[in-house]
Amino acid sequence: MKKQKNSGILVLIIIAAISLILGALNFIDIKQPAKIQPVHKEMKLNFNRNKKGYIAKITIEGVIQERNRSYNQEWLISTIKMLKDDPSNKALALFIDTPGGTVYEADEVYLALQNYKTSGKKIYAYQGHIAASGGYYISCAADKIYANRNTLTGSIGVISGSSFDMTELLSKIGIKSKTIHAGKNKNMFNYNEPLTAEQEKIMQGICDSYYEQFVNIVAQNRNMKNAEAKALSDGRIYTAKQALDNGLIDSIDSWENMIADMKKFEFENANLSVEEFSYKKDFTFSDIFMEKAFGTGSSEAFEKFFSESSMKYPAYLADF
């Protein structure tokens, strides 16, 4: 029994230590300033070299939240606003490769894109490896949605949070934990108290509210009746072919052909350049630490884990 207790305590200590290390490294990293820069070095921030103007390509990748290794909300919103006000910018082409993220940030991007369109400019969206949940939510702001034939999309639904009841485990290893609080539902989701039926109902109500918002976004932007959109909104992932058959996207094609279509149908084949924008974060101390300690590719894996584990719910997120 004593050995079992010691093992349990050791596990908790290890988990706590890893969480503290990742949290500290993440805190160091998020102080990096947001940058607006083209993908290719030879592309300078000179938007008047083509008198006819340019199409802006914005890459949206990684988990959608305030900021992480590959995503920065402030950068994205400010870039969209800047492009709206730039007379040389004629349209926006989104490259979306994300499993989604928080409801707040996903909706903020959607609204920023809708505001961009008030200038009379068009938006086309191209879905990469995955454009699910919040990624699809953002796609709905586009006038046309294209996808690669191997794209996974859809996952129209909401996660309001996860409850972990550790009271039995703590009791077995001899640890007592109590949170002093006022208000019977103030301590929801704390590991030291089980979730009550009333609390589950509260969270389900929040979840349902954001779900209806998502369904309405799909219905409005995909020219569907609400009932039709809801029938497609059970949280499942769709292949590109399934999404096309169900009216969730407009075409399965390449990025290059989407740009060609954009120029043909929106600008009568005008010779517009395509200027690329993506959030680029410097290789940081935590990246170096992870690569040295755990091997190549580990920094990306740890970032994905930390981004999702620190997610602020509710979320439009496909988790697989």
Which positions does each model-derived feature cover?
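N-terminal organellar transit peptides
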Residues: M1-Y124, G128-A131, Y146-N148, G161-F320
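Flexible glycine/serine/alanine-rich "lid" or loop that lines and gates the nucleotide-sugar donor pocket
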Residues: C140-A141, D245
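Catalytic cores of alpha/beta
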Residues: G135
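Zinc-dependent metallopeptidase catalytic helix centered on the HExxH motif
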Residues: A141-S160
